[in-house]
């Protein structure tokens, strides 16, 4: 990181950190943005040391600008960062990224006007820096500098490793900057495998060449001396034109950029190949339950690159499906951020979702909610008087059960008072038996503390009419007991009543 961070130092670093990312925004550029730009340039096989000078930044901008229309959001962010860094190197005062882009556009327009004016004054197109790899030698002649083996090796390695994934297109655009049709054919011929894809590319090129011939018919009559013939579709593709003719068209006044036209046809064919090699639709990209949000975003934008749609449609897809296809945890966070949240804010908010710390935090919140609800219910008195009252079936007292009762065990059923079965097998649906073994209170007759039967006397007692018969006191008492207590006799429980003797 130290080498990357040494791009700016001192006063330039202070200027860099004062520039805002967006107009009237809160976030400003930091050192980490330079580190990120260096890593992105390494991905595109561009030397990151070019960021250290203004001329190097200008070269990077020249390579990235043609791919802005079809590039991803990361490519646009890289272009914006390099443009802002160029203004810092040139000591151009800017307040935000938009002002830096406006300054770059003004400078490019001025340089184009100067080049056109110089070409009109001198009568030749000596725009050396605009037409690399076509350079001017010491004799003032425009010559072609062949594409380097290092560039070809980088292109072949990308095709072998990526196999026409979406990032192949910006890589091809960067490596073929300013190339002639002959250079482009050399790059295509170095691809050994994937011949089916190469055949599809040839068909696309032939279709575009036929469309060019239809839109640019040949003018009748001879060609004026000193003028070049107009290129046909096959000339642009490099099959019926020589290298000198290609250089002549590209350096003529006005120039015909046959290299850029052919490059555009190739990129159109590569888009079709990428679509074939990446059959996954953007609708199928969904975040897994344990997948980090960063990996999900990488897969999303990689698939979005392969979509054959305009930039407006891609922006709508990003705003809609990026949040909609996230997992429930991330979706809850993203919806809370609102629709105006930036990608950086989304990734920061969803950082760590699905990991151990996030799960522990969710569990703690759930436990806190349960504890709070339980406390509220206790405060409301929902658990008041919930304790069950225990009563003994043996003695009838409260506070213990029959198993722990110290009183003598009552015989028979505790419910109906009859012997021969237990209470659990009792079929009597009445009330529980009292200590006498009888059901009380009885639904028939008088209460237990009243005399059960008391016949009204209609004549004098019987003994008054029995003259000569004597009855003992014990017989008299038994007779009284039977009359007073026909259902239950206390004598059976306590023997003879002493009070009656």
Swiss-Prot record:
Region described as Interaction with Gp41: 7-31
Similarity comment: Belongs to the primate lentivirus group gag polyprotein family.
Region (PPIA/CYPA-binding loop): 217-225
GO CC annotations, alphabetized: host cell nucleus; host cell plasma membrane; host multivesicular body; membrane; viral nucleocapsid; virion membrane
Mapped zinc finger ranges (CCHC-type): 390-407, 411-428
Descriptive protein name: Gag polyprotein
Residues recorded as bearing Phosphoserine in the entry: 148
């Amino acid at each position: 990181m130290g080498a990357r961070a040494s791009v700016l130092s001192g006063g330039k670093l202070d200027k860099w950190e004062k520039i805002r990312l967006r107009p009237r925004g809160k976030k400003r550029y930091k050192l980490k943005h330079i580190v990120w730009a260096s890593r992105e340039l390494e991905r595109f096989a561009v030397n990151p040391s070019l960021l250290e000078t203004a001329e190097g930044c200008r070269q990077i901008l020249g390579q990235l600008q043609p791919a802005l229309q079809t590039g991803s959001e990361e490519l646009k962010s890289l272009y914006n960062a390099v443009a802002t860094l160029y203004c810092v190197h040139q000591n151009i005062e800017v307040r935000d990224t938009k002002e830096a882009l406006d300054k770059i556009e003004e400078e490019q327009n001025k340089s184009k006007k100067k080049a056109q004016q110089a070409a009109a004054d001198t009568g030749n197109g000596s725009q050396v820096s605009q037409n690399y790899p076509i350079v001017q030698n010491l004799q003032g002649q425009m010559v072609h500098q062949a594409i380097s083996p290092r560039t070809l090796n980088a292109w072949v390695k990308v095709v072998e490793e990526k196999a026409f994934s979406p990032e192949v297109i910006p890589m091809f655009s960067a490596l073929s900057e300013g190339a002639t049709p002959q250079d482009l054919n050399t790059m295509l011929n170095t691809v050994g495998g994937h011949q089916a894809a190469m055949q599809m590319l040839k068909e696309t090129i032939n279709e575009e060449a036929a469309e060019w011939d239809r839109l640019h018919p040949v003018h009748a009559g001879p060609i004026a001396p000193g003028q070049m013939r107009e290129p046909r579709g096959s000339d642009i593709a490099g099959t019926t034109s020589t290298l000198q003719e290609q250089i002549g068209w590209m350096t003529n006044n006005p120039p015909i950029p046959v290299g850029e036209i052919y490059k555009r046809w190739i990129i159109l064919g590569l888009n079709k190949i990428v679509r074939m090699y990446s059959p996954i639709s953007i609708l199928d990209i969904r975040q897994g339950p344990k997948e980090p949000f960063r990996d999900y975003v990488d897969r999303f934008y990689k698939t979005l690159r392969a979509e054959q749609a305009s930039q407006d449609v891609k922006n709508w897809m990003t705003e809609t499906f990026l949040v909609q296809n996230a997992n429930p945890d991330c979706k809850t966070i993203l919806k809370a951020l609102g629709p105006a949240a930036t990608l950086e804010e989304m990734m920061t908010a969803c950082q760590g979702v699905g990991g151990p710390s996030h799960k522990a935090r969710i569990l703690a919140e759930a436990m806190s909610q349960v504890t709070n609800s339980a406390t509220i219910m206790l405060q409301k008195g929902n658990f008041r008087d919930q304790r069950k009252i225990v009563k003994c079936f043996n003695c009838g007292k409260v506070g213990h059960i029959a198993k722990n009762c110290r009183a003598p065990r009552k015989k028979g059923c505790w419910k109906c008072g009859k012997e021969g079965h237990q209470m659990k097998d009792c079929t009597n649906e009445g009330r529980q038996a009292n200590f006498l073994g009888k059901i009380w209170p009885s639904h028939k007759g008088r209460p237990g503390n009243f005399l059960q039967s008391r016949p009204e006397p209609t004549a004098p007692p019987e003994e008054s009419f029995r003259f000569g018969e004597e009855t003992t006191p014990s017989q008299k008492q038994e007779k009284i007991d039977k009359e007073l207590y026909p259902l239950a006799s206390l004598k059976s429980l306590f023997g003879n009543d002493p009070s009656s003797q």
